[in-house]
């Protein structure tokens, strides 16, 4: 049966959303399996949590160099090469016989991640129907949210009953299946508007874009100061069961899907207010993490709001980058991906230090302090650069 060009375009967007799903499942799998990995290597959760920092900082440091090295490559073949490295590295993660082998395997996953996220958002915009670009980005974000709502809880269930190693091997096998789908669905995609090293000085002369990058690293650091250690927090501070921990991760991810839907509906109407409110709600959630940990119901409610906020603001910042750098999208998104992951790594490291010197219960307060500062800076940025930031991605 012959498909219409519009349905074909949506199938391609869906295929990239599935790719986003498996990449984000792999990135955040250690969050759901932290205690099990720590027990396997006779280490503490805080020590093992550093693999999140290492992974994120490899992505942060390598996103732009990897993108520039591949800037002239045809995108379909580049995606296939990325998936081959990704699948092999995940299988090796599952087979890791010591902590250092696990780190090396995770670095392989991180390198594939660095290239994937530097090109994928712009590819989705390019492949989407002409009048549905913001919705296509929202669908890509849904792939990310599904990694939280399905990938992390299912990965945790598999790890709980079959061992954490099986989780990583399964991720590698699923990635291979998605790769075959991409090979069949995607057309030849010559590099377009990728930019080059010459684009970098031009981007760095755009103060509004630099502010968006700065806000990104601040709010992501705040989020991951607490979220990197949410599993041991639920188990050891909230004193909830392992099964309820899985349910909370499911709730958090489901809230991310709601955040994606809210973004699709309201971000164009309220480009400034939508982001500022998202920042503020994230700050409130982190501030209330410990006070509301007294019961499963209160913590579940908090996770719903938290999940909505982080997804909404992540999407909002991504659209601002694409809008402010439409002439060099791949370079701009490589920088965004790198900066986002520097925030992830910084948050995981800051959380590690909070646990070491203050205690696990205080991770929310430290994250909240960062988030409040980020919210104030967000308001200032939108006031200062309102003429360029109060725009949306419409074409």
UniProtKB/Swiss-Prot annotation:
Cellular compartment(s): Cell inner membrane
Family annotation (PROSITE patterns): MFS
Name of a matching Pfam family: MFS_1
One Gene Ontology CC term in the entry: plasma membrane
Bilayer topology annotation: Multi-pass membrane protein
Function: Involved in the efflux of sugars. The physiological role may be the reduction of the intracellular concentration of toxic sugars or sugar metabolites.
The protein, known as: Probable sugar efflux transporter
Gene: sotB
